[in-house]
Amino acid sequence: MQTNMKFWLGVFTFAFCMLICIGTFADAYPSKPDNPGEGAPAEDLAKYYSALRHYINLITRQRYGKRSSPEALMMTDLMLRENAESFPKYRYDEPFMW
């Protein structure tokens, strides 16, 4: 009985912690502004478009971190650089045989 109680207490604690973590992740992302509708006044539409522009700027902003450091960019360039031999040859680049 005691082990069963400890088991369910652990399950409940884990589920509660997961709900808290999911809630904090959901609050961290900005919510999309509400559309005022078809027959909305011009002032409401202006506010909506301003909020929408702000929302798009937030979710598409450039993030700076380790990937934007010069060393990381140089490594990426070296890894992705292709030499001339790695490009496939096209059949139409060669002269016609007939």
Curated annotation (Swiss-Prot):
The modification Tyrosine amide is found at residue 64. GO terms for cellular component: extracellular space. One of its GO terms (biological process) is neuropeptide signaling pathway. PANTHER family: NEUROPEPTIDE Y/PANCREATIC HORMONE/PEPTIDE YY, PRO-NEUROPEPTIDE Y. Residues 1-28 form the signal peptide. GO terms for molecular function: neuropeptide hormone activity; neuropeptide Y receptor binding. The lineage of its organism: Eukaryota, Metazoa, Chordata, Craniata, Vertebrata. NPY is implicated in the control of feeding and in secretion of gonadotrophin-release hormone. Belongs to the NPY family. The keyword Secreted applies. The gene is npy. This is Pro-neuropeptide Y. It is found in: Secreted. Keywords: Amidation, Cleavage on pair of basic residues, Neuropeptide, Secreted, Signal.
